[in-house]
Amino acid sequence: MAPIGDDASQTLHDLVNKLESRVKELEDKLAHAAGGPAPAASESVRMILMGPPGAGKGTQAPKIKEKFSCCHLATGDMLRSQVAKKTPLGREAKKIMDQGGLVSDEIVIGMIKAELEGNSECKGGFILDGFPRTVVQAERLDAMLAERNQKLQHAVELQIDDSLLVSRITGRLVHPASGRSYHRVFNPPKADMKDDITGEPLVSRSDDNADALKKRLVTYHAQTAPVVGYYQKTGIWSGIDASQEPGAVWKSLLGVFDKQKGANGSILSKITGRS
């Protein structure tokens, strides 16, 4: 087949642009007629952020939130918020927790749905942190999003070797009076175990016990492996080396987002391979 000439290519380009505009109009009308939410803007994100304790989720999530003007839904925070607001779901969750039970998947999914519908920050998309933890939860999340004519774009896992993670976490030191923090390896004090400013003794954080952390990591990997497998099959999983400096991790995240943007190219780019 002969290559398409420049004139013919431009004509095709113009025609496809008109078709894409028309398709967008029809999609908007169908969504409105069905009473569903309007399609999200192209510059939005719907993602899950996974990673073991200390991998850097707390550092990267605010950056993602700022870039996309989206909401960050950490399940623990969300649960406490719903309980504090005394919403129907919050009251139901509190009753279960007061009895020592575990909050059901249905309640958590309901809380996520309530945030997506009522939280104005979620118009730019969302970052889910701490959910799903099982394949069943992942399937129920997909079903809820499908009801909203949405689907996840990314499942990003911040990956780091357990031994490095243990040294990163257990090496943390703090000056109790001021809150100044140090690290035995990455940011050591000038004098061993002494605060640089006052010379007072530093202490290890009580929640940074190596044995306790190792147990948490065993649980994390056992829970996460099947969920990672689920999202690998759907094609939205990405793994990022979290042992890098935070700036390098952020650059890797931007690469994931740019790759998705390229994958969602125009009809013309899919036909011709040109953007």
From Swiss-Prot:
Family listed: Belongs to the adenylate kinase family. AK2 subfamily.
GO biological process terms held by the UniProt record: ADP biosynthetic process; AMP metabolic process; ATP metabolic process; DNA replication initiation; pre-replicative complex assembly
E.C. no: 2.7.4.3
HAMAP family, sorted: Adenylate_kinase_Adk, Adenylate_kinase_AK2
Signal sequence, renumbered to the chain: none
Subcellular location: Cytoplasm, Cytosol; Mitochondrion intermembrane space
Residue sites binding ATP per the record: 54-59, 172, 181-182, 244
Assembly notes: Monomer.
GO molecular function: adenylate kinase activity; AMP binding; ATP binding; DNA replication origin binding
Binding site for AMP: 75, 80, 101-103, 130-133, 137, 205, 216
EC supergroup of this enzyme: transferase
Gene Ontology, cellular component aspect: cytosol; mitochondrial intermembrane space
Alphabetic keyword roster: ATP-binding, Cytoplasm, Kinase, Mitochondrion, Nucleotide-binding, Transferase
Function: Catalyzes the reversible transfer of the terminal phosphate group between ATP and AMP. Plays an important role in cellular energy homeostasis and in adenine nucleotide metabolism. Adenylate kinase activity is critical for regulation of the phosphate utilization and the AMP de novo biosynthesis pathways.
Lineage summary: Eukaryota, Fungi, Dikarya, Ascomycota, Pezizomycotina
Chain intervals for the UniProt region annotation (NMP): 74-103
Catalytic activity: AMP + ATP = 2 ADP
Protein name: Adenylate kinase
Domain note: Consists of three domains, a large central CORE domain and two small peripheral domains, NMPbind and LID, which undergo movements during catalysis. The LID domain closes over the site of phosphoryl transfer upon ATP binding. Assembling and dissambling the active center during each catalytic cycle provides an effective means to prevent ATP hydrolysis.
Highest taxon above the source species: Eukaryota
A Pfam short name: ADK_lid
Gene3D superfamilies xref list: P-loop containing nucleotide triphosphate hydrolases (3.40.50.300)
InterPro entries reported for this sequence: Adenyl_kin_sub (IPR006259), Adenylat/UMP-CMP_kin (IPR000850), Adenylat_kinase_CS (IPR033690), Adenylate_kinase_lid-dom (IPR007862), AK2 (IPR028587), P-loop_NTPase (IPR027417)
